[in-house]
Amino acid sequence: GFIHLTTAAFHYFKAHGGGHIAVISSIAGTKGLGSAPAYSATKRFQNTYIEALEQLARMQHYPIRFTDIRPGFVATDLLKGGRYPMLMQAPKVAARIVRAIDRRQTVAVIDGRYRVLVFFWRLIPRWLWKRMPVRNR
């Protein structure tokens, strides 16, 4: 799904003189999350795939822009009834996504609280991270 759609968009924009590919991944791609290993690995793959396509477009001089949108927890039916930290309302998230695309941001971590969280997550060494009881509920 993700690879086919993103690659199709890349080839379409390559053939038509440029464009902007925006994908929604997640902050879960920042670190391996023991509470959701497959999910965090998939999101990390998406981050890396977009980064690689962006580099390819630049090397080949294709005028294709990319925005990797990385929200945290968004209040949707999928999360209904659960207790999730820093839950964001969907309309607010949608407005921030539109703003990130309009500003041509390469990576957009949605919401300042999550930007701070991601910043600190990246500072945690692997030996310590694997000992932390990170939960998503």
Task: Annotate each predicted stretch with a short phrase.
Residues 6, 42:
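Active-site helix of classical SDR
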Residues 8-17:
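A short helix-coil junction within the Rossmann-fold of NAD(P)-dependent oxidoreductases
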Residues 14-15, 57-62, 74:
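A short hydrophobic alpha-helix cap/turn motif
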Residues 26:
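Residue(s) in the substrate-gating loop at a strand-loop-helix junction
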Residues 31, 52-64:
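Active-site-adjacent segment of SDR/Rossmann-fold oxidoreductases
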Residues 31-37, 82:
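Active-site loop immediately N-terminal to the catalytic Tyr-X3-Lys motif
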Residues 65-71, 75:
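Conserved SDR Rossmann-fold cofactor-binding beta-strand/turn motif
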Residues 68, 80-118:
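C-terminal helical subdomain
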